[in-house]
Amino acid sequence: MLSPEKFQRDTFAALNNPQLRRNFKRAMSGLMEKRQAVFPDAEEWQQLRELGSLIRANALRKLPELLEQLEANCTANGIQVHWAETVDEANKLVLEIAQRHKVKSVVKGKSMVSEEMELNHFLGQHGIEALEADLGEYIIQVDHELPSHIIMPAIHKNKEQISQMFHEKVDPETLAESAEEMTAIARKVLRKKFYEADMGVSGVNFAVAETGTLCLVENEGNGRFCTTLPPVHVAVMGIEKVLQRLDDVPPLLSLLTRSATGQAITTYFNMITSPRKSVEKDGPLEVHLILLDNGRSRMHSDELLRDTLLCIRCGACMNHCPVYTRIGGHAYSATYPGPIGKILTPQIKSLHEAGHLADASSLCGACVEVCPVKIPITDILLRLRHDKADNKRNIPITESGVLKAKIESLIWKCWGMVYANPILYQLKSYKLSKVGNYMPEWLPLLRNWTSVRSKPRFAKKSLHQLAREEGLIDE
């Protein structure tokens, strides 16, 4: 559940968890160093991200026609295309496909859209077991947690914590000491599930309208298992993932892998264009593609907010964010944490439910500097902050203006009057110098500040007075 109060509580808990802080510092430092190592040439980096931004912007500019082209070419290739306006519709589509084929177990590759849909929980409610096949996702599923990072879901855990968890919940006879041993434990469980699964579910990194091709980027091979071994493959994707041409994929793939994990290229890159053909010996008999909107069309209608949809889900903004790297992903209580989550979640949910996330930023701009597709994250954050209190314009965000507080508006109006009038300003300064330091910390206007910071002390003399006494001002 999203709320400002829960976010504050979870933030305090994270900041007071030394082990979590150490885990994130180690992981984030390593990711930043690896990314820097694969982008040694600043000029090449700027040229590549300019190209990536243009490719994504071009696709968004032509989004309606490209989606129609994607549907037509996928259908011609034998892929069954479905449209879902909401996560409820998307979940029902997956369930209908599963029930039609009497599916009892599902294996899932990495997919942020399926997390957005809360698909595992939904299928479980209808008696269908959904097992995560990505190692990081499997770890947090076994431990009944949510992902804390969009690329590395279990990054908040260290090796010892994962080993102990596997010992307690997966293989009581083994206490693994190395990453290889832990991987072997997971592989032993997952391999059996791959062969038993009735349906595989995957995400989509890029969908090529020109050819009707679905592209999946991965490192572990689980995505390939999920999309080839079960007789039915269901791919779920946000409508913004479409690209115009096959030639658009290589630049974005290069940006994605290097920005995400510091790799020149991932271990596996899957391109799916059709179900199994009659002359082929393996592959799914049916492939379904579910195109999810869930507020994306609303974002697309606004010139600035549309840039949110440029995202290729590399996670670089998170790795460099001074807020995320200190509190982790769970504090956000959202599918998408970090800088991209702060601008995406309020638009997917509503400003009333998630608008507070836009305030959790210092606006330092580190996320903007490392974004491979040049999303103006800080500009969008400021826009969302403004829209929380502005209900006078035609704003394409759910419940805009809902957080406007009358008392806050009155305070800012008074502040403006004081700072616009020299006499009132001097009177305010004089009064604060006399009584300001005696104000109790429990006052409503001070409490939020003093709960985490020292109360500011007011000087007895203003800077103007001191300068005049020193003869620095010629009256």
Task: Indicate where each model-derived feature is located.
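Predominant activation on well-ordered alpha-helical scaffold segments within soluble catalytic domains
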Residues: E71, N120, D247-P250, G315, ...
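Conserved, hydrophobic alpha-helical core segments of structured domains
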Residues: L309-A316
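The feature marks the mature, well-folded catalytic cores of soluble enzymes
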Residues: M1-L304
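Residue-level detector of anion-binding/catalytic polar loops
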Residues: Q80, E129, C317, C367, ...
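Intrinsic disorder at enzyme termini
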Residues: P4-L31, I407-E475
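Ferredoxin-type iron-sulfur electron-transfer modules in oxidoreductases and energy-metabolism complexes
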Residues: V279-T308, Y324-E441
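Short coil/turn segments at secondary-structure boundaries
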Residues: G136, I265-Y268, P396-T398, K406, ...
